[in-house]
Structure formats: structure tokens, C-alpha cells
Amino acid sequence: MKLTCVVIVAVLFLTAWTFVTAVPHSSNALENLYLKARHEMENPEASKLNTRYDCEPPGNFCGMIKIGPPCCSGWCFFACA
């Protein structure tokens, strides 16, 4: 039981150490990531996650059985809603 706990703690420590040392060489890399995320929260247009280039706009044919890209709205009944 003690050995299992020691192994679990060691794995968690090594995993955390890997993530800490995997940061780019800049001394304020974590701060830059935080500021970028905060900027995207304050300005949703700056976020790349909000844009979908692989979806069909409303009115386009979307198919009966998911032929082609999905609709941007998520609703498909022969044509995107």
C-alpha cells in the first residue's frame, strides 16, 4: 500500500515537472499565456475558437445523411437552418 502511494506521488511529481520545464525559454511565458487568454475573454472577436471555416452557412444544402461539412448552426434538415 505504501509503495503504491509512493509510486502515485512520484508519477504526479514527474508529470508536473514535465509541464513546468516544457514552457518555452521565455521567463514570462506563463504570464503571456494568461494575458492572451484574458484578452480573448475580453474581446471574443480575437479568439480563433469562435470562427468555423468548415461549416455550411444557412440555406445551403447539407444532405440527408451528413454529406459534406456540418451546418454552422448545427441544424440540418436537407438545408442548413
From Swiss-Prot:
Q: In which tissues is it expressed?
A: Expressed by the venom duct.
Q: Where is the signal peptide?
A: 1-22
Annotated protein name in UniProt: Omega-conotoxin-like TxO4
Task: Tell me the classification of the organism that encodes this protein.
Answer: Eukaryota, Metazoa, Spiralia, Lophotrochozoa, Mollusca
Which Pfam families does the UniProt entry name for this protein? Conotoxin
Q: What role does it play? A: Omega-conotoxins act at presynaptic membranes, they bind and block voltage-gated calcium channels (Cav).
Return the similarity comment: Belongs to the conotoxin O1 superfamily.
Q: Which residues carry this modification: 6'-bromotryptophan?
A: W75
